[in-house]
Amino acid sequence: MSAAGRRGLIVAIDGPSGAGKSTITKLLADRLGYIHIDTGAMFRTVALAASRAGIAPDNDASLAGLCADLEIAFVRNNGCCRVTANGEDVTDAIRTPAISALTSAISARKVVRDVLLRLQRHMAREGGVILEGRDIGTVVFPDADVKFFLSASVEERGRRRYLELKAKGQEVSLDETIAAVARRDEQDSGREHAPLRRADDAVDIDSTGLSIEEVLDRMESIVRERERATPGA
């Protein structure tokens, strides 16, 4: 689609697990008036559906059939973005430690990635969107208008995840949560298909020790500058 026919830019935010991508992307989308497409939530939704159906993460034939029958959508409810699977709100169900662990294995399967890749590109075709994940700027939208690589130290990311899980009433330890984040990094960086990798033209944002507002201010400034330089955006 030409720039003149678009509603805005395509913004890609990549980074490791626990870097705060979902929180930052949602808030940045609100500031910009863009749509937030949470690609990580899409993989988590497939993982949840596979878990419920008893499908092993290496059973490509069954995963293909599962994806074909799975309708994933993002809807706004009272100002909050919710994830649905075939009409069921699964926003909270996809955020458990068990589903988090399964998601890394599921997201490594090419059959799953291919289906979700087509869906993500379809959702973002008219621009005015922010997508976050681990390979948005390298695989899904290598020509995205703005690319960010959002990161933080393993300890910082583990601490954030620990506090998030505790707030939900889950019994976890800080050391175990940090170790789980480190394992996820290793899995995501070493997988065969679309491993976690920083795009060469991405802007690095290290959020260690920074407030959410500080991170948002910097990222919004970069996007606004690109908007002014892009006709039709």
Swiss-Prot record:
GO terms for biological process: nucleobase-containing small molecule interconversion; pyrimidine nucleotide metabolic process. Signal peptide: none annotated. Keywords: ATP-binding, Cytoplasm, Kinase, Nucleotide-binding, Transferase. InterPro entries: Cytidylate_kin, Cytidylate_kinase_dom, P-loop_NTPase. Residues 183-201 have a biased composition (Basic and acidic residues). It catalyses: CMP + ATP = CDP + ADP; dCMP + ATP = dCDP + ADP. It is found in: Cytoplasm. It comes from the Bacteria. GO terms for molecular function: (d)CMP kinase activity; ATP binding; CMP kinase activity; dCMP kinase activity. ATP binds at residues 15-23. Residues 183-202 are annotated as: Disordered. One of its GO terms (cellular component) is cytosol. Its EC number is 2.7.4.25. It is an enzyme of class 2 (transferase). NCBIfam families: cmk. Belongs to the cytidylate kinase family. Type 1 subfamily. PANTHER family: CYTIDYLATE KINASE, CYTIDYLATE KINASE/PANTOATE-BETA-ALANINE LIGASE. This is Cytidylate kinase.
